[in-house]
Amino acid sequence: MDFDAIVIGGGHAGIEAALALSRLNFKTLMITQNLDTIGKLSCNPAIGGLAKGNMVREIDALGGEMGRIIDFSMIQFRVLNKSRGPAVQAPRAQADKLMYQTKAKETLERQDNLDLFQDTVVDFLLNSMRNEIEGVVTERGNKFRSSVVVLTTGTFLRGKIFIGEYRADMGRLAEFSAYGLDKTLLGLGFEMGRLKTGTPARIHKKSVDFSKTEVQFGDSDIIPFSFSNGKLDKSQLSCYVTYTNKKTHEIISENMHLSPLYSGEIVGNGPRYCPSIEDKIVKFKDKDRHQIFIEPEGFNTEEMYLNGLSSSLPENIQQKLINSIEGLEHAVITRPGYAVEYDYINPIELYPNLESKRVKGLFIAGQTNGSSGYEEAAAQGLMAGINAALRLQNKKPMILTRTSSYIGVLIDDLVTKGTKEPYRMFTSRAEHRLNLRHDTSDKRLIKIGYDLGLVDEKRYSRYLFKESRVEEIKELLKQRRLSLKDVVDEQLKKHVSKDFYHILKDPSISLDNLIKIDPSLSDSKVILEQVELDVKYEGYINRQKDLIKRLDNLELVKLPFDFNYEIIEGLSREAREKFSKIQPATLAQASRIPGIRSTDITVLLIYFSNPKNKVVINFSL
């Protein structure tokens, strides 16, 4: 059977890729090993967090689905870093795992132009003359033809799980690995490696003594992840906090030789910023305790997730170390923790549009690219789906810049630097994070989603109304002046005769203070928060915008794909090798490649400034 596009895998990357392609009116097929595990939250039952929550809102602004699914399935909501500045605040929600999964599958099943099929892809159909994808072959011998393929295998490509001495060819506990494509990819010359991740044990709620733990409530005011949702009124479940102790650490240290992480069994690098409890004990010997979050997995399950206690130690040792923790003395394990090792492709094998440099029409997204996390996977899946659709239309790729989004930072880091360990997004990876606040995701990206056709007219009109109202309130603030009779407290006295706009810049004055004086300024919480942040941080934002404008000038220098950098005189040997391998899309990307000198960038600029070299440069530094 023929399709326009095929998506391999039903995880978070696959979901976004399949929906983007089908919503852009391309006949799409998703092939996954088990239709009942589409959208499964394999590890922690949560979406969002620092930088990750921003990405979920960016996905939503572009027309993706993750924000709507978590809004539907959340069981607790919190804004992280509330006491700190807006640049590092982020929404995070606990999810009902089964509800999330069910909603994801239902969304796919009801989508026009999209078929789902349960099978395992083992090979590609290729036009070897043009080095171009033409479809896939499955384990059962089915052949499906298409012009583009999006590969999102997650942890399943030659996946292997470890629990003490137990080994099994699985991508998740009780779910078989995928074989076949690994040989195809190696045969095509892809640079591949092994990575490792892990998950903690789950325990039964009735076996926890919550009186010995600290309760963590959700926020009463829920900020929807999706801009299409208004106020959310949800029942929320609490999370709980406890800590490891000296006894816990002794148990782990005494049995470290039984951990496949330290016995040499696992060769793949694990996530630096989400280490196993074994790693924590080895690398942070000075710490006498580590925080553990006991998180519910849903409304209709008694299983609890032990966030911070990922382990691949033998099951009896996991039981001992868990029972050594306060509140968990009688905890009953329902599922053991384990490590999983899997194949990945070095992402420098990809262009910035996530298309493979080796095979035309093959796009790759998610953990297959060396990233870690549901949100990182979904972001790449959406961008791969969008760019696969643009390729089908013979249109230019859509590449988000580092200054426009966390998604842009994510993909640029991956395809420019590659990775040797699971890549996780942080606010610190973005040079201009004040410009990438989660509340401005629609302002930055919704026009792109609208122009693509992934954001409908109704939703875009609602955004335009919101923005016009924000600007209207700012104008009212500039026009309204504080009179002596308005002063109700000492803080305002020094601002008499000033306009409200400049008064609001005072850190000690909130917009609520001014609304009490003039109720006509009142509006929805979302609009008022954006107004206040825009005004208070206007100076910082404008300075960042000036810097971004200068940096974006380098993005305007587009470099040709498949270019022979050996012909450019004056480049260092290292620059020639790295430019030839990575094939940067812009001068800005070239400048971010590790090891590249400023002189190499100058040489490129001079070379491509020559009109005969067919690169149009339109900027002024």
UniProtKB/Swiss-Prot annotation:
<dbReference type="InterPro" id="IPR020595">
    <property type="entry name" value="MnmG-rel_CS"/>
</dbReference>
<dbReference type="GO" id="GO:0002098">
    <property type="term" value="P:tRNA wobble uridine modification"/>
</dbReference>
<dbReference type="GO" id="GO:0030488">
    <property type="term" value="P:tRNA methylation"/>
</dbReference>
<protein>
    <recommendedName>
        <fullName>tRNA uridine 5-carboxymethylaminomethyl modification enzyme MnmG</fullName>
    </recommendedName>
</protein>
<comment type="subunit">
    <text>Homodimer. Heterotetramer of two MnmE and two MnmG subunits.</text>
</comment>
<keyword id="KW-0963">Cytoplasm</keyword>
<dbReference type="GO" id="GO:0005829">
    <property type="term" value="C:cytosol"/>
</dbReference>
<dbReference type="InterPro" id="IPR044920">
    <property type="entry name" value="MnmG_C_subdom_sf"/>
</dbReference>
<dbReference type="InterPro" id="IPR047001">
    <property type="entry name" value="MnmG_C_subdom"/>
</dbReference>
<dbReference type="Pfam" id="PF13932">
    <property type="entry name" value="SAM_GIDA_C"/>
</dbReference>
<dbReference type="Pfam" id="PF21680">
    <property type="entry name" value="GIDA_C_1st"/>
</dbReference>
<keyword id="KW-0819">tRNA processing</keyword>
<keyword id="KW-0285">Flavoprotein</keyword>
<dbReference type="InterPro" id="IPR049312">
    <property type="entry name" value="GIDA_C_N"/>
</dbReference>
<dbReference type="InterPro" id="IPR002218">
    <property type="entry name" value="MnmG-rel"/>
</dbReference>
<dbReference type="InterPro" id="IPR004416">
    <property type="entry name" value="MnmG"/>
</dbReference>
<dbReference type="Pfam" id="PF01134">
    <property type="entry name" value="GIDA"/>
</dbReference>
<dbReference type="InterPro" id="IPR026904">
    <property type="entry name" value="MnmG_C"/>
</dbReference>
<comment type="function">
    <text>NAD-binding protein involved in the addition of a carboxymethylaminomethyl (cmnm) group at the wobble position (U34) of certain tRNAs, forming tRNA-cmnm(5)s(2)U34.</text>
</comment>
<dbReference type="InterPro" id="IPR036188">
    <property type="entry name" value="FAD/NAD-bd_sf"/>
</dbReference>
<feature type="binding site">
    <location>
        <begin position="270"/>
        <end position="284"/>
    </location>
    <ligand>
        <name>NAD(+)</name>
    </ligand>
</feature>
<keyword id="KW-0520">NAD</keyword>
<dbReference type="GO" id="GO:0050660">
    <property type="term" value="F:flavin adenine dinucleotide binding"/>
</dbReference>
<comment type="similarity">
    <text>Belongs to the MnmG family.</text>
</comment>
<keyword id="KW-0274">FAD</keyword>
<feature type="binding site">
    <location>
        <begin position="9"/>
        <end position="14"/>
    </location>
    <ligand>
        <name>FAD</name>
    </ligand>
</feature>
<dbReference type="InterPro" id="IPR040131">
    <property type="entry name" value="MnmG_N"/>
</dbReference>
